[in-house]
Amino acid sequence: MASEPEGAGLLDDEPEEGEEGAAGDVGGGGDTGTGGAGGPEALPSPWAELPGGRRFGTLVHSAMERVDFFAPDLEAELGAVVDSQLAYHRMDLDREAFVAALAQMIETPLGPAARGMRLRELMPKDRLDELTFELPLVGGDIPKGKLDVRAIGDLLAERLPAGDPLAAYAATLCEAELGQAVRGYLTGSIDLALRFTDQELMAPKFFVVDYKTNWLGAAEEPLTTHHYRPEAVAAEMERGHYWLQALLYLVALHRYLRWRLPDYDAELNLGGALYLFVRGMAGPETPADDGTPAGVVAWQPPAGVIEELSALLDEGSGS
């Protein structure tokens, strides 16, 4: 019988109703007018007047799963989807503000990792929504090895260069309290798996995409894109253990592509993970740092890391 591994709480998603993310004060939260010293001017968040909490997060995910990003009339497409989902989820909110916020998020560039593409450019044939997976851990029902989360940290510490966004997080995974053995099956679903053709390599690239509705600003401040600048969303990725979630999602996508693509090459085809903190995404004019817009977290795994992690989850650490 399938089961989730012990320690599955590490993969919790959005905070509960009324709970704020912890990253709003990273680097000084009081100055919401600019992107920091020498940074771009912040924009008001299109999501500022919309509610928080898990119910709203579920609504956003349900809408994004059903919207045709490539529809000729995006506003009409969004309006129809939002109307149906508001009726289903029975939520009372500003319908026009929600449609506008979704539209601006879909129009926001995804940064250099995705060659600046927007979700708006994604055709239905190039997306898989809610890609479900079941990963057996060290043999599943009949364990054939030992595994704990610290072994993942050890692998990352050994393989990631110092400047990699996950390098510091590796130390967190190596902490003693994460040493409890995990076993069974890891089940879940990926919000979106997208495909685009890398024109330089003339090869399809596949990315894991995860939508996050976390509210990172202080309650007394107007929410802006400044609250979703790189250091703020990076801190939230670590606080929520979203980096671990991204790693496991990439293993799931890697195994799926290995099964479905005859000529699959992880180094060539596995693009990485895009975590979209939607409240920081304000359309084409969203302030960017080194080309990556506010609210967008991108990670491209070094060659071989995801394959090695997949093998570790399958075989265990051997100790």
Task: Pin down the residues of each PLM region.
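Structural signature of nuclease core domains in nucleic-acid processing machines
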Residues: M1-S319
